[in-house]
Amino acid sequence: MKVPSWKTITGLAAAAILALAIGTAPSQAATPVQSTKVSAGLSASDLSKLPLTDRHLTERERANLAVVLQAYHDGEGDSLDPQGFMDLFAADGVLNGIGGVEGQTSLRGTQLSGLIVFLSQFLPDIHRELKQITVSGDVVSIELSIQGTFLGPFQTPAGVIRPTGAKIDFPTADFWYLRNGKIEKFDCHIAFATLFGQLGILPDYASAVAASAPGGN
């Protein structure tokens, strides 16, 4: 089966970024559920189950962590809640998607749910495995893997990449900045190159070499 070339990745990233920038209204998302907010008072038992670098958190840090954990819950395939996700942000909150060809795409307002909706469209069973969590005041830093099964179409300007049923697992680093119990900024660093490789988009080294040669286009 012929797979898209590495040059196509630019188009794919553009499609992804376009999908994120436009976003999808909560009413259009796949089977959204009513938001069920977690308690701000995470217990010692709750904390013991998490991969925390330091379990001695202040009350404010526990509350901030609870907000972030709720955001992940709202982005899971079996509990997708775009509106609930947006409600966790401050009025001027921003989500920065980082790692694509464009470098950074910023989402605000009704666009904030664009990232979780975009990912759930081709990974309907999406799950985030949290590997390491560091809480420092109003900043929550998390190393994680985004996992799922390629069961939905992946839209690109060149056409649709049809689902293959492949298992997807790519690394991500998330940095959450909170203010007064709301998310002020969410920087999401996604390893798009790893994701594209698992979707079957292979590098086209020959074209890159040709383009770099004298007189190349």
Where are these regions (language model features)?
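Bacterial N-terminal signal peptides that target proteins for export
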Residues: K2-A13
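C-terminal segment of classical bacterial N-terminal signal peptides
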Residues: L18-S27
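Short, low-complexity N-terminal intrinsically disordered segments enriched in polar/charged residues
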Residues: A29-D87, A91, A211-N217
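A solvent-exposed, acidic/Ser-Thr-rich amphipathic alpha-helical stretch
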Residues: R62, A66, P82-L144, T149-L151
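Residue-level detector of short, conserved catalytic/binding motifs and their immediate flanks
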Residues: A71, V140, D174
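Short, surface-exposed loop/helix-turn segments at secondary-structure junctions
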Residues: G152-T164
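Short beta-strand edge/turn micro-motifs at domain boundaries
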Residues: K167-G200
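Thiol-/selenol-based redox modules, centered on thioredoxin-like
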Residues: G200-V209
